[in-house]
Amino acid sequence: MPPAEASRGADEPDRGAYAQPTPRLLYVHDDLSDEVAERLGPASPAAALTRSLFALLKRDPERVVVLTLAEQVERVIAQGRHAPFDLALGIGRAGERVAQALHAKTGWFPRVHRLGLTREEDGRGDYHLVSTVPATLAAQLAGRLKGFPASESLAVVDDTVFSGLTLRSVLETLPPVVLPRTHVFCLRGVSDSIAAVARLCPVTVGVAGVGRMLEDVSFINASGLVLRVGIRRRARPPLAFFERPQWIRAWFPGRDREVIAACRRLNALLDSGG
C-alpha cells in the first residue's frame, strides 16, 4: 500500500483541470528554510533535509530561480521612497508578513491589518476568492475602513501577483473615494497581471516575471511544496504540491521523483515535530 502522503490526492477527479505546463522560468520563493530552522533548529534533520531539497531544486539554474525574502524586499525598496501610509492592508498572513518586513526596513507601514482571503479551486478548473474569516471581503473592508478619511493614504500589500484575481478583487471592492490614494506593494509577480492591477492604482513590485503566465513564467512558494497549504480546494482537504505529482513533473522534469520523496520526508518530519 502506498504511503498516505502519496495517495492523498491520487484519486482527484479534478486533477486534469488544473494541469501545469513546464515554464521556461520558474521562481521558487524560499519561505521554508527560516521556518524550519526556527521550529526545529538549524542543526535538526529537518533543516538538513530542507537544505538538500533546495540543492535539488537548484540543479537547473537556467530555469529555476530561488528567491529569498531579503532580496525581494530590497528590490521593492529600490523602486523608490514613500511617505508612511496611514493604513496598510496585508492580504492573508503572507501579505501581512511582507508589510511587516518592508516596514522594518522603511517605516512605510506603521498600521498593518490583515485581510482574511485566499484563492480556492472550485473543482472545475477555475479559482474563486474566499474569506478565511467569518466575513465577506466587502464586510472586512468596511470594518477596516470605517471612519477612514478619503484624504488618507492606503497601501495594499501581498506577496505575489499571479493571475491578479486577489488584488483586483480587493481594489474593485474599495470605496471609490479611497482608491485614488491607494498603492499596491508586492514582492513578485507576472508582468501582464501586474499591468492589469496597475490600471486600477500604482503598483510597486520587486521581481516581475515577463511572459505568459504558466507557460513562460511561474511562481511557487517552497512551503507549498512541503506543507498542506499550497492547494486549497472547495469542501475538500488542502494538499501540498508534492501530492500532485504531475505538477512536480512539470516544474522539475527529470528529478521529480527525488523532489517528491524529499518533500514527503520533510512533511513527515514537520508533522512529527522532529
Model-derived features: where do they sit?
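PRPP-dependent phosphoribosyltransferase catalytic core
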Residues: 2-57, 83-84, 101, 105-108, ...
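Short glycine-rich phosphate-binding loop at a beta-alpha junction
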Residues: 84-92
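Glycine-rich phosphate-binding "P-loop"
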Residues: 49-68, 157-159
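Short, glycine/charge-rich flexible loops or terminal/linker lids adjacent to PRPP-binding catalytic cores
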Residues: 107-153, 164-168
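Cofactor-binding loop segments of dinucleotide-utilizing enzymes, especially the Rossmann-like FAD-
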Residues: 91-93, 117, 186-189
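A short, well-structured juxtamembrane/interface segment
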Residues: 59-85
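Structural motif
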Residues: 87, 153-155
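Short acidic, S/G/P-rich loop/turn micro-motifs used as interaction or catalytic elements
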Residues: 95, 160-165
